[in-house]
């Protein structure tokens, strides 16, 4: 077996995107002879770090947690919102075994299918498109009685914006010819997370026994009456719609929120036999399903169970007897360890970690170099002593100084990074090692909002650089994403990628 160059260094320049526009672009403005030389002379290109390419909704800017998860996993790691949306688009949602089992059992017994959740397009806890899909699933599987218990938003959406969402679901039921909205209540009651059980009790009694403070003929009338009482969406009081509906033994109940924290309390009331927070008038025996896992302690199946990431890069390197070093300063240490390892806290066998403290300043524009020089000292030392097969480093400057919105400081941050990259490349050349230079998402390449002229402190959807430093004659293919980086590293290391890694090498 031929020996591969050692070490292979993955440099993650956090928040270092690429923009063709020179406007407010700290990367463009900075004096960066090393990166300019690499860009002109070695294999390089751009890869995507945002939207569906990293498991987020279309057009959504990337972030450090998601970026490092994708970089280390070697596959697109879909977030819960996106997992559900993608399953609906692909048609898989309508065959989901957990939901279908609950619905089919209820249908076979002539029972009702109830589903509940936050009815809005906020996309933080739920999405109305998911509720529409649930209505369609119940209809397709033969349910005659389909009831939506709608929780109104007004926090992740404007305070009085529920009318359009109600209209959408009313239209869905009308088109299906089956089903209706059975109740309305504000999320203040149904989605408490502070153990205010008096609020949760009102939601539970409304859903299970149809007991509302108010009854309205239609959901729209119920909403209008709430507004007339001075309530905004979040605080709409328990309102039963039409003939009050009850949840009976044998019914299916599906909670359609994908975010866990505000779904736990109401779920507990439905499924805990020894529940003691308030006295339930009834606890019907239902087929209860959560869209995701709300807590391990809640005895209910999840339609989209948490995916455990097997054979992430760190794990696979360990299985193949490779040594690795993870290094970052405080601000990004969790990203280069926990998130890069697919949500695992403990180091893998043969993995060592170095944490360099971030400087104690109020904001990093006051010290744009942060602790990058100290991080670089330790990497150069590790390269020279040849102890590790792989070194993964995060440089926090582009992101943390980018968030300050101070252009001059961001330029200094990029210039500092250029010096650090130069030192690492020089050390690698001495020992015959290799490097990949990339980023997790954009930020520092846009420091002002073009429309307002104000400081731009957020991430961007710009692509990020991908640079190969080494002696092999390789080319960078187009269309790469963050999930392709780990398979690229395995190719350089002479290792077959595991089946779980669906990314493909960027170097060809």
From Swiss-Prot:
UniProt catalytic activity: (2R)-2-phosphoglycerate = (2R)-3-phosphoglycerate
Pfam families, alphabetized: iPGM_N (PF06415), Metalloenzyme (PF01676)
Catalytic residue list: 64
Protein name: 2,3-bisphosphoglycerate-independent phosphoglycerate mutase
Its job: Catalyzes the interconversion of 2-phosphoglycerate and 3-phosphoglycerate.
Keywords: Glycolysis, Isomerase, Manganese, Metal-binding
UniProt GO cellular component terms: cytosol
Originating species: Pseudomonas fluorescens (strain Pf0-1)
Cofactor binding comment, as recorded: Binds 2 manganese ions per subunit.
List of residues binding Mn(2+) 1: 399, 403, 459
Pathway assigned in UniProt: Carbohydrate degradation; glycolysis; pyruvate from D-glyceraldehyde 3-phosphate: step 3/5
EC number from the UniProt entry: 5.4.2.12
Gene3D superfamilies linked: Alkaline Phosphatase, subunit A, BPG-independent phosphoglycerate mutase, domain B
Protein encoded by which gene: gpmI
Gene Ontology MF, one: manganese ion binding
Binding positions for Mn(2+) 2 per the UniProt entry: 14, 64, 440-441
Transmembrane segments: none
RNA-binding recorded as keyword: no
InterPro entries membership: Alkaline_phosphatase_core_sf, BPG-indep_PGM_N, Metalloenzyme, PGAM_B_sf, Pgm_bpd_ind
Assembly behavior: Monomer.
Positions that bind substrate: 125, 155-156, 187, 193, 259-262, 332
Enzyme class per UniProt: isomerase
Membership in a protein family: Belongs to the BPG-independent phosphoglycerate mutase family.
GO biological process assignments: glucose catabolic process; glycolytic process
